[in-house]
């Protein structure tokens, strides 16, 4: 029979899931961070990743709507503000669009979503469905991938600035903000999970939620790797740098 874990034991199990399954282990990220991708491949990554960025505040709004405690809502709503900002020129979504602009992508194309890989779209929609349909505890637990974000952000920024002459620190401003936002958010979510996962069944659910979220992130990179690295099978309507030259700024 499975024993109830202490809060610290539960945290250790959650961190072990991240150490094994977080997308920093994916080969595509190794290529990205070590300068092994060309400009078109980096563009494809940024364009597809925007779909995930765009849906983060939708995910957080869905979670917020299920919170009955005003104090809890006041804390969680900061996540929405972080990404939506106070204006169209502020926030995480705007900063990601600044990155795609800097990479030479047409903003209308990026925002339209019409050049996405199907795998990207399906993975992001699966995540939105999860937080809407599962328990509040599971939805919050699914955000715990942010525990592992600062490490990959540091690798990404350092690697991209070192290896890609078409990337600047200004273009990567999104990640600078996440270095403070992600630890704040994950500390709160981890405390919530450790406090409320107070049965064996609930502890199994929160571990499964983190496992699922890791698979969402991994699936997006699988789609990118198959399409833009090897074997190079691109959905006919997805972004192709050479073919879409007319849709990408010089």
UniProtKB/Swiss-Prot annotation:
Q: Per the record, a Pfam family?
A: TENA_THI-4
User: Where does the source fall among the domains of life?
Assistant: Bacteria
Q: Which InterPro entries match?
A: Haem_Oase-like_multi-hlx, PqqC, PqqC-like, Thiaminase-2/PQQC
Identify the metabolic or biological route this protein is part of: Cofactor biosynthesis; pyrroloquinoline quinone biosynthesis
- How would you classify this enzyme at the top EC level? oxidoreductase
A GO molecular function annotation here is: pyrroloquinoline-quinone synthase activity
**Protein EC:** 1.3.3.11
Q: Which cysteines are joined by disulfide bonds?
A: none
| Catalysed conversion reaction | 6-(2-amino-2-carboxyethyl)-7,8-dioxo-1,2,3,4,7,8-hexahydroquinoline-2,4-dicarboxylate + 3 O2 = pyrroloquinoline quinone + 2 H2O2 + 2 H2O + H(+)
A single GO BP annotation from the record? pyrroloquinoline quinone biosynthetic process
The family assignment reads:
Belongs to the PqqC family.
UniProt name for this protein: Pyrroloquinoline-quinone synthase
